[in-house]
Amino acid sequence: VYMSGSRVNCNVPNDALADYDIVYVVKDTKPFYEDSHYMERFGEILYMQEPDRLDASVGKKLDFNEKYTWLVIYTDGNRIDLTVCNEKKADITGDRVYRVLLDKDGRFANAPVSDDRARWVKKPSEAEYAAVCNEFWWCINNVVKGIKRYEITYAQDMMNYYVRPMLLKMLSWKVGILTDFSVSVGKSGKYMNKWLLDDDYEMLLETYSGGLAGEMYHALKVMADLFDKIGLFVGDKLGYEYNERDSKAARIYMDMVRKMKL
């Protein structure tokens, strides 16, 4: 039995909302997935999800005899993500952040030392840096067209699923530079405020807009300003050239489309 995730990672905040990610390595998973009442021993269940069963119900091919997972929230507020799996699927080295709770058969005697290095921000190559810059500025055209046409759901998707990830990537590289690439910023950059300047973080928060066209234009402009600022910083520190031509061109197009009569 081992636990992984934030509960065993000393480098991330830990509070009452942190999940318990528990894995039981067993010889036979069938008794567990056929009758899960044993989970009630951990407390009264408020509600739960069985992602493997849901995936199988829509045609995804899964072998419950290899691995099965439950996501459970109890009435006391605790959440347990519990997996039973055979030894073949016990991926203790893949996560690298874990704590062995019980090892009756000595299966984890030679397990590597637990750490979160695999999640640290990685220094980008010059090609990766250039690609992120180009993707950010290019994808802005889809956002501004969506706003202009009042296709708000489309524009929001373009902003949040294509443009924003590039901004967060660039911000994570700044954090990497400030920390000698020795930390993780967490999923969706949720820990970045620990290292970013207050002004930078406040600008980032300003990029999360509502559904009004004016709000979205403003958020997009702030995104562009912040990306320029951080992109120049990262490029300077790593010795990479920042593509100011794309930045200027994208801004020209943004203004052109906003003033356009359809």
List the model feature ranges, each with a label.
Residues 77-107:
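A contiguous, low-structure linker/loop signature
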Residues 13-16, 94-95, 185:
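Short aromatic-enriched loop/helix-cap "lid" or pocket-rim segments at secondary-structure transitions
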Residues 120-262:
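Conserved nucleotidyltransferase catalytic core and NTase-mimicking acidic/glycine-rich helix/loop elements
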Residues 8-9, 29, 87-89, 177:
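Short, solvent-exposed loop/turn segments at secondary-structure junctions
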Residues 25-29, 46-51, 96-98, 105-109, ...:
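Glycine-rich loops and low-complexity Gly/Arg-rich segments
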Residues 4-17, 23-82:
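Metal-dependent nucleotidyltransferase catalytic core
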